[in-house]
């Protein structure tokens, strides 16, 4: 790829080459983007883009660090509170491309 890549191309390359799944904050820091909402928007679009190439954007779901509740929603946006114990100590979802 050339040196001039879009933010989405950078995210795709980052998620494809990373050994461990990455959080939205880690992705934002690595591509130099301050707005997490843009990264969330990009991830939703990237899921469609990589599917055309025969790959998948995989998401490790968010989890409550207090009670262990695993969020079932396939939403990219991280939850704010646990529905079971109301804790805000949430491990954010992690993403990778395989």
Task: Give the ranges of each region predicted by the language model.
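Short metal-coordination and nucleic-acid-contact micro-motifs, chiefly zinc-binding Cys/His arrays
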Residues: 60, 78
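Short metal-binding segments enriched for Cys and/or His
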Residues: 90-98
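Short alpha-helical segments that sit at the start of domains
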Residues: 1-10, 72
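Short helix-capping/hinge SLiMs at alpha-helix to coil transitions
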Residues: 16-19
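Short cysteine-rich clusters marking metal-coordination/redox-active sites
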Residues: 63-67, 82-85
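Cys/His-rich microdomains that often coordinate metals
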Residues: 71, 89
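A short acidic, leucine-rich amphipathic alpha-helix
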Residues: 26-28
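Charge-enriched amphipathic alpha-helical scaffolds
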Residues: 34-56
